[in-house]
Each structure stands twice: as C-alpha cells, then as structure tokens.
Design a protein with these regions (language model features):
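Primarily marks secretory-pathway-exposed extracellular/lumenal segments that are disulfide-
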Residues: 1-63
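Catalytic cores of phosphodiester-bond hydrolases, prominently lipid phosphodiesterases
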Residues: 62-340
Length: 340
C-alpha cells in the first residue's frame, strides 16, 4: 500500500508551520521583523548600522565654521576656548586713559580681530541718580572714595548696540559677556532689552550639560551672560559666574607666577577663565609687559598646563592690552589641542 507523504512547512518558526508535515515543501512564510528606526545614512555622524528604517534623525558634520572653526560646531560650549578682553570698554579710543585703561582700541577693533568674549563693568554715573538711564560702563572702585566713573565712562547703549549689530551679522558666532554688575538687575535687563540682546540670551540649568555651539546657533540663543551678583535669582539668564564657573588668579606679578589654580568660584564646574594679564608695582595693569603675557607660545603652553591640571581646556583666555601678542591665535591653537 502506498502512503502519501504529507508535505508542508516544517519550520516551527514559520507562520504557517504544519505539525503534520513530514516533508518541507518550501512554502514556509515568516513574519516581518519589527522595524528598527534610526539613521540609515553611513555618511551621517549618528549612523546606526542596526537601523532598518530611517527616522529622519541623521546628523551631519557642519562644514560652515562656528566661531571661526568648523570643528567647534559640535563641541559643547564649555569645551571651546574663546578669546576675551578684560574691561573691554576701558580703552583709549573710548576716552578712558591710564591708569584706568586696559586697551588702546575699542569694541569694533576687538570684534574685527576675533574677540567673542568681553568683560564689562556696570555702574551708575553718580550715586545721586541711580536710575536705569544713568547706567554706564566705568572702570574703578567706589571704595576709594570717589566715583568709578571719575576716569571716564562709556555709553552702554552705544557699545552694546554695536555688539547687537555684529551678532546679527555673524550668525555662526557665540558671544559671551561677563559683567561685574553694580546696578539694579532690572536696570541691566532693561539695558539689554533696549539694544535688542535679551531675546538672544541663553538660560543654562546648573549642572546640566552645556549645548553645542551649533545647538545654540539653531536655537538662536547666541549670547551667554555671566555676572557677579549671586544673591539675585529672578533673572535666570544672568548666570552668576562664581556659581556656574571659576577663575584663576588675575593681575599676577610675573608670567612665571601664573598658574592654573582656582582663585574664586566652583572649580567643579567646567567653565573657567584663564586670566592672563600682569600688574605693575602700583597694582595697575602693566602695558609695558603685555607683549610678554600675550605671547602666543606662552599662552598656549599655559593653557596646556591648565588642561593637564583640570582635564579640559580653559573656556576663556582673558587679556589686557589685547593689541600686543595675539590672543585670538592662541585661542585657535588651544582649540586644536587634543583633550583626553
């Protein structure tokens, strides 16, 4: 007697598995695997070789520079080194002269050279009129018994108005202000409102990761503001720089005494200022030795020491008499250093 062989799908993993089948007939049908969503473009930075379906999340390396260098675009803000002018407004061009001056040329020359971080001091022109309209940039110490504006003052609406114009024209640059503030917080905010900078200010959450430069650019939050006013918390876009960062010593006696030890602030924070200017015997900024302090090789070597000490490059290289030496070139070279 001839017994017919039962043919069918004999694979238990198939949708049409036939447990009665004695011989596989090639008819097995298998379920479609669940899609794995991700970036399927091998040229993308976040290519996922496991992905089967593209979800539109592919990210590509920027080719247009951010702050002058394409490699900076995808770096977090705190991993970029910015050239910075100390008391940026206190210049001969702005009619503030020695001993109160820190530079010869004003904002426009600084910006054109590549400066993208600026230290500013806000004061009232006189104590008798502490109104918003009386805010000025002045360099001095009221504890000496006379107004900090005695040596001269700079109109902050004009100065910051120039900054706003340049930020608008350089859409790929992130700018930082560090403000030694001696006026009401609301008056400082009103000043930034007046010149059109407020909408650009980034708000950072303490101890969270800093965004990359391209993320700040895409958010159109291209201005980061630090200040010295820790008790004021109603203005979150003004970041207390001793809470959100730290600083090395400033106004050293000699370049040989410059180090990377924290002077003020929270050295557990990743943002820090490498202050890099000298004082003379009178305690004033020393223009006679600015070329020595601002020497490119010296600044890069010092930054390298800071990287070795703290595991990251300094966020700011802050100088006096920026026209001497080349802090912009030094910052560029520091940004090329490989950090473990």
């Amino acid at each position: 007697m001839i017994v017919d062989i039962v043919r069918g799908c004999t694979d238990e993993n198939a949708e049409n598995y036939n447990q009665s089948a004695e011989e596989d007939d090639g008819s097995c049908v298998y379920p479609e695997p669940d899609p794995v969503f991700g970036c399927t473009d091998p040229d993308a930075m976040n290519y996922d070789e496991e992905a089967t379906d593209d979800d539109g999340t592919c990210e590509y390396m920027e080719t247009i520079p951010c702050n002058g260098m394409a490699i900076l675009c995808h770096r977090p803000y705190d991993q970029v080194t910015f050239p910075e002018t100390h008391n940026a407004f206190s210049t001969h061009e702005d009619n503030i002269f020695y001993p109160a001056s820190n530079h010869r040329t004003g904002f426009q020359a600084q910006w054109n050279a590549g400066m993208r971080a600026f230290m500013l001091d806000t004061h009232y022109l006189n104590d008798a009129d502490q109104s918003a309209s009386n805010v000025r940039f002045c360099h001095g110490d009221s504890s000496r018994g006379f107004s900090p504006c005695t040596y001269g003052n700079v109109d902050p609406w004009v100065w910051l108005g120039k900054l706003e114009s340049e930020i608008q024209s350089e859409e790929r640059d992130i700018v930082t202000l560090l403000i030694e503030n001696h006026v009401e917080a609301d008056h400082l905010k009103a000043l930034l409102d007046d010149v059109g900078l407020s909408d650009m200010m980034y708000i950072h959450e303490l101890n969270s990761e800093w965004p990359t430069l391209i993320e700040l650019i895409n958010m159109d939050k291209r201005l980061v503001v630090f200040w010295e006013q820790p008790s004021e918390t109603s203005h979150p876009y003004f970041h207390d720089f001793l809470t959100f960062g730290w600083t090395t010593n400033y106004a050293d006696d000699s370049t040989s005494s410059m180090d990377c030890n924290p002077l003020r602030g929270d050295d557990s924070q990743p943002v820090y200022h490498m202050n890099n200017w000298l004082k003379n015997q009178a305690g004033l900024s020393d223009p006679t030795r600015s070329a020595e302090a601002n020497d490119v090789d010296f600044m890069v070597e010092r930054a390298q020491e800071c990287i070795e000490d703290h595991g990251k490059r300094p966020t700011f290289l802050a100088v006096d008499w920026w026209e001497d030496g080349d802090v912009v070139e030094a910052a560029r070279l520091v940004n090329l250093i490989e950090v473990p």
